[in-house]
Amino acid sequence: MKELIISLLLWIGAETNYNVDLAHPEIKMMSQTALEHKFYGHKKPANGTLHAFYDPKTDIIYLNENFDRFNAFHKGVLLHELLHYVQDLNDVVGKKFQCMRETELEVYPLQKKYLLEVHGVVFEYDELYVLLQANCNPNMF
């Protein structure tokens, strides 16, 4: 996992202006049920679509225990969360973005670029959904 994190951080450094000379984040693997409970708590029913998340309060990346470091999609998921970690440690919230949710507007296109350029995988995502999720006032809709 260490080598994968190093290679992903190097890619992030080459594609962005962020400082990536950072301590590696702690990675915790957990079951799908535990992952969703940790992220959603009791607020939302689990639906099995959460792959991972970054907790900016603890600087921990939580991954599904079925993470496969040889799977391109899984590498893209880890890249996505590492981007949030790098953004957080580069203090982009309040400078480049109004809130942490808004950082998704940068992360999804970079994840798409990484998967296509490095793995030849076309990653499609719903840009409108991401735009809505990136809203700093989630109760607006």
Which sequence ranges carry the predicted segments?
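Mature extracytoplasmic domains of secretory-pathway proteins
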Residues: 69-71, 83-86, 96-97
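Stable alpha-helical elements in mature extracytoplasmic
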Residues: 4, 8, 74, 78, ...
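Post-HExxH zinc-binding segment in Zn-dependent metallohydrolases
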Residues: 97-132
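Short pre-active-site segment immediately N-terminal to the catalytic Zn-binding motif
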Residues: 62-78
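Auxiliary, metal-adjacent structural segments of Zn-dependent hydrolase domains
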Residues: 1-61, 71, 117
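Substrate-binding clefts and substrate-entry loops adjacent to catalytic sites
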Residues: 63-64, 87-98
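Active-site recognition of the HExxH zinc-binding catalytic motif
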Residues: 76-89
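Acidic/His-rich structured neighborhood in mature extracellular/periplasmic domains
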Residues: 49, 89-90, 100-103
